[in-house]
């Protein structure tokens, strides 16, 4: 864990981007905990989990973020990876568009891998945000750099929760 400290960056003007798990209503807390338990007890060595939905505004980004936070609450190294490059709820909800280098910058070759990983207030949870909006997200995430990123993050984290775009066109 100490080695991680040398490459994790501070998120500028970081605000708490999701309520603490304990601040959620009981039913929401329980749903997140059941999901977390199902992942842990699946029998598979699930390390990278994609969260998606049929259409926008169904709550996938909130679920993905809170699931990451819940796993970190168990002292598991957890990474929230925002891959909704065209329409990131997390970036827009918290007004971070011009404040961070993110996945887009890395995939376009203008930022190093270590420059896009940000720590949160939870020492077990980090985030990679989308960064700039890109006109060609499918091409970016299907390239070699995305594969390299996932391979490296698998070494650093117990869980990687990937917030993906909705399945149906936006």
Q: Residue ranges of each PLM-predicted region?
A:
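P-loop NTP-binding module
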Residues: 1-170
